[in-house]
Swiss-Prot record:
This is Glucagon-2. GO terms for biological process: response to starvation. It comes from the Eukaryota. GO terms for cellular component: extracellular region.
Amino acid sequence: HAGTYTSDVSSYLQDQAAKEFVSWLKTGRGRRD
């Protein structure tokens, strides 16, 4: 179960990081353009 929990947490963290990265791209690039 520990392995499953760890992989669930890392997929969650990767998902959050991806969403933050996408919104950073939208806001950051939008301001520059």
